[in-house]
Amino acid sequence: MNIYLDYIQEIEDRKAQGLNPKPIDGAELVSVLINQIKDVNNQYRDESLNFFIYNVLPGTTSAASVKAKFLKEIILGESLVAEITSEFAFEQLSHMKGGPSIKVLLDIALGSNETIARNATDVLKTQVFLYESDTSRLKNAFEQGNKYAKELIESYANAEFFTKLPEIEEEIDVVTFIAGVGDISTDLLSPGGDAHSRSDRELHGQCLFEHNKEMQKALSALQEKHPGKRVMLIAEKGTMGVGSSRMSGVNNVALWTGVQASPYVPFINIAPVIAGTNGISPIFLTTVGVTGGIGIDLQNWVKQKDADGNTIVDKDGEPVLKQEYSVETGTVLTINTKTKKLYNGGKELKDISTALTPQKMEFIKAGGSYAVVFGKKLQTFAAKVLGVTAPQVYAASKEISIDGQGLTAVEKIFNKNAVGNTPGKVLHAGSDVRVEVNIVGSQDTTGLMTSQELEMMA
């Protein structure tokens, strides 16, 4: 009980900072919530229900493990909660990514109760974050003749978790917001001095634009003025996202301008739209892909050339630029994902096909690159179990091979571990194929944020 009252006190303290209750990642607090939910006369029951449903972090957090077990009790009829039906319990499990929620769903799908096994199987068909313990269990059940295991593996082999997702909108309306002129560092988006708060996403969100409240208010006002449109954050006459705080920087931009990933998980947003006159920093652009976002190279200012093709400079030695089109704050633009062009009304401004490659379109559709990577792995597993060739669902591999050119150390590692590429073909930089990986290293981590990313990826 004390831990719950401590949480209530923390909520009051956060209110003074303009913050909502902090998402729960610990098992002990969730256990207290469950006890209070079970006690229909408990004075804290209503708010405990709300916290349990809408404020528990997913994945492999200890909180998610306790939540998943209680949802299983509800589905099996071992616990009765009027506000959480069996259907609603399945709905919540479907949003918990992987780890304990997958174990619970497999327990039910491979169990003896036909009705709920059917429901669990239908939910599992939408999931991609299965690990070796999960797939091994599924394979064993398949070999023992379990019909739902067979149905699941056939679904995974056809990658129905991807093919049955909603198609990407043909037109995405955005309204521009110039975050700065010149290169924009990740420090503007996620200052290094605020690194301590990066795992508390709502708190960290307050440091966007280096705590510039006027800019934050202007961004919010723009959103209120243009409901239904996404805000596109822009580096005018520069490159967006230079610097090293790429993940927390993208998290902050997504928090302010993106889409909530799940109604049951607060302050985790995806799909930000960002742009720069000179494009996006490569590692920042990759991280945008992790969240299923869009990064656009605007080229709305171009360097002027003289008759000999040399860049014209001003008295300060800076290149003279000519504006090709305006993206001043408040400009409404349309991203067409079919034509892969950027429009202002009916006027075509720019070909943006590099922002909407087949691979990047997959990330957008799946809600991020992790889901695509795990999905490909799951499809490969299922096809292997069935002894069939996996159908071509994802974008075809891109193989770049340059005759007579040697390999860098990284290219050698890449070639040694490539999967499904043309046999005997040597691949060079720019290739996009599957590789087998069993070790992941990082040269730069920020403690809690990194562990949180891993837990919520499940």
Regions found by a protein language model. Give the residues of each.
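Generic amphipathic, hydrophobic interface segment in small proteins and small subunits
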Residues: 34-51
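Fe-S-dependent hydro-lyases/dehydratases of central metabolism
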Residues: 95, 108-109, 116-458
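Structural detector for internal amphipathic alpha-helices that build alpha-solenoid repeat scaffolds
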Residues: 17-22, 46-61, 76, 83-98, ...
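Intrinsically disordered or highly flexible coil/loop and linker segments, enriched in small
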Residues: 20, 42, 419-423
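Short amphipathic alpha-helical segments that mediate assembly, nucleic-acid/protein binding
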Residues: 4-7, 30, 45, 68, ...
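Short coil turns that connect the paired helices of HEAT/ARM alpha-solenoid repeats
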Residues: 38-43, 76-84, 109-116, 141-147
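Amphipathic alpha-helical packing elements
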Residues: 2-39, 360-364, 369-374
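Amphipathic alpha-helical scaffolding segments comprising HEAT/armadillo-like alpha-solenoid repeats
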Residues: 27-35, 58-77, 98-110, 129-141
